[in-house]
Amino acid sequence: MDADKQLERQLEKELDEMPAEDLDDDAYDEYDLIVIPDQGKGSPQQGHSESPQQEEEHKSEELRQRSRPTWPPSSAGGDMTTIELISSDDEPSVEETEGGNAAGRGRARNDSSSSSDDVGVIEGSELESNSEVSSDSDSDSDNAGGGNQLERSYQELNALPSKKFAQMVSLIGIAFKLNDLEKIESSVLELQNLATVPAHVWLKYLKARLVVTQTDEERKAFEEQCAKALGYYYSIPLSEYVVNYLVDQGNVQNHVLWAKLLADYDVERPDFGDKLRSLISTITDENEAAAFVEMLQKHCVTWTCNVEQRQMIKSVVDKFKQHLDETTRGWDWSEQHKAHVYDVETLSLDDDLKNAVIRFIFERSVAKFPIVDVLWLSYIEFIQFEGVTVPENEDENEVTAEMVAKRAKRLGKGFLRNTELDLANRGVRSHPSVQLNHRFLDLMERSDFELAEVDEEIRLILQRIVTDMDMTVELHLDYLAYRIRNTNASDEQQVASLRAAFNHAWEELTVLYGDQADTRYEVLQLWAQVEYTQLGSPDNGREIWRQIMGYPGSSIRGLLWLNFAQMESEYNGGHGTRDVLRKALSQPVLENGLMVQEFFRRYERCYGTYESIAACQALDLPVEYVKPRSRIKPNSQSAYPRQQKLKPRQQQQQTNREPLNREQRRRQAHEQQQQQQQQQKHGIKKSRTEPSGGATSPPSKVKGPANAEAKESNFKYSPNMEINKIFVRNLHPACSKEELHELFSPFGTIKDVRLVHKLNKQFKGIAYVEFEKPGEAQRAVAGRDGCLFKGMNISVAISNPPPRGTSAVKPSVAPKRRVPTSLIPTTLVRQEVAAKKLRLLLPEPGDISSTSASVDVAIKREANGEEQKGDVQERDEQKGEEQKGEEQKGEEPKGEEQKGDDQIGEEQSGVEQKGDEKKEEEMPAAVPKSNDDFRKLFLKD
């Protein structure tokens, strides 16, 4: 016994004299969480001041740690309570929860202190900032006091019956500060029941767990924890740590751990497989090695990839990783990342390899942006493999079986193998949102979850999102809709349970948020409508509406009265509709009172009598309720900061002058009005006098990509159709010139490609491609119009640009239709049209009276701007005028009818001669066709 103590002291002395760099020389320094405490925190001599029994325990623990050469030893004379755990070196999530650090600092006792951002993800900085230890000092009392304070904080938080998310994060941080493995494990597992534990927290926990792992059973339990940690988030640091552990241990017995790990990470990290191949070569049993390789081929689809396939996968992976590194939090998945999935689908690989690469894209995306719900929803849509239409000629059963097989291949066989329900659960546990909660509830209903299971999941989500009132209300409404769909109205027990669910939801919202929760009374309105419709109890529905209208402020809201009246009218036979509307219009003030009054009048006209209609019309409309304006804060910014900056100093000086009397104000207003009129006239004259090509607009200060590219490109704007240039639209946002050149180069020689951008450097999704020959452009239109390019159906057409816009100020109203005009007087044109009509309508050469009447009518219509009528209609009008003329002739004096035949013949011949002369005068020899011809008419001598 004395020899053992002497050996321990000798080893302790050698360890104290050993340089620090020798202590840190270890293969696992990159992931090591054990740090030698500095002299300020405690010196090795502190162990001698303790009791002999504690000292002996510390030394025995120290010897046990030294007996393991693979892993770094602990500090001399220290136990597990003196090991300091630092944060991991893995890449944390980009999304940081605002106020998360403040939630963890000194808020152990404040249960109500939380914010809406508490539903965010956990960052490593939060764990480091929680429950900071007091400042370092040389005295043992300070260190002991800090430890006692942390211990008290941990006990107080752990004793809470229902912990909030922020409190659980604080609990984990305190546990890591205390360096107590049992506390760390219990706090991590407790958080695991509520939310998804991030990868960097798992990494810290595994490093602390490995320190005390020695026996085979402990190593087996440790590997089980590694497998559990790998099933939450895609994390390269975590996978590297597990792979390095297995390689250093020479562990090839855990076939499942290796196979599932490579199934998830071999796409990005083929070096993991290379390390495993070197270990497989050391297996002496050929049957065991063959079975292991067979399992790897079954799980990891990239295990047997050749060099060419690896190169194709590597190009897509590297491109996506670069894009992901450059991507910030403000992006749109459907517009930005959809092209990467399309690139994978166009590769000449089998479906298993494509699905593996696409899963990698999704897993890396949700690992970096875990709170972006659209990523989780897109991932779920990919796994579901829905939206594929069955052809008419194909057998539906065979196609369905094929789709089921393809869907099974999309799931993968690694630790991150998730169905759509598992993905929705992961997304909700990572960061709940209204869309994700709705999707998760829908998938649980499709999977035939029991009501108790659904209630438990909803309870966990509500516990997580208690700080977000709007999301909580939406989740309650989604849950109530689920209960309505799954309630049998003929079962009294289910009906009572449904009513209890409505009552519980309303009471819980009232307790949590008071009068601020569900101010539109959507829960109660839904309950009332269910009572009216599905449960067939209008009395209960009316009672719920009376409860709604009894709340403060609801009686002045006209839309609520309208909904109440409509339910009574539609589902209760209109028994209480009149009373509801009369009570609404009897309010002193009312929002949307006109809508209520109009509805009341329509109802009375449809179902009422003369007396009831008159009584309804006699009701006065209440005063419109005007919401009080919110006070402007002193530090609030104006909505028009530019206008405030551009105010002249004269207006600021005028505020200091004496107020003007009425006459001075009238004169000032008159002068301002005259100045405005003069400015408008001056602007109109200036726009009229400016030549079309003489004045040049000032150069724009904004130099966007469109301007820069216009200088670089050889394109020239043409207002006419360009038969050798094509116009392409509906392109994906990340489109480049090289991609378009590659797309259209098979149809001919491309001279230039131009992408059109906005001034804010945003791509419009359109481009111009110019070919050398028109035939090449025609072939490009025929070959590429409507084709699928990077996930988008593009449209290709011959370029026919509209007239180029000018820098003039556009009118605020729609511009009038412009018609091409010339300098030829419209009278001559009308005469030409009338002459043509004369030739067409002339039935006989001698019928002068009818033709002259038709010419007059035609000229009159043209002069008034009326539309030209058809030939049949004109003939009918002409006959009517001839009949009127004959009737007028019958009323003339008889003396005129008794004229001689000779005199009548002379008059008719004179009329014919005059008509011929008039016809020759009205029809010129040559109608001017242009401005030059028109000038020649007036330049003749």
UniProtKB/Swiss-Prot annotation:
Outcome of substituting E453G: In RNA edited version
UniProt effect for mutating T213A: In RNA edited version
Outcome when changing K183G: In RNA edited version
Phenotype for E190G: In RNA edited version
Record annotation: effect of changing S116G: In RNA edited version
Subcellular location(s) of the protein: Cytoplasm
Consequence the record notes for mutating S430G: In RNA edited version
Function: May be involved in gene regulation during development. Binds RNA.
Protein name: RNA-binding protein 4F
Source species: Drosophila melanogaster (Fruit fly)
Source organism phylogeny: Eukaryota, Metazoa, Ecdysozoa, Arthropoda, Hexapoda
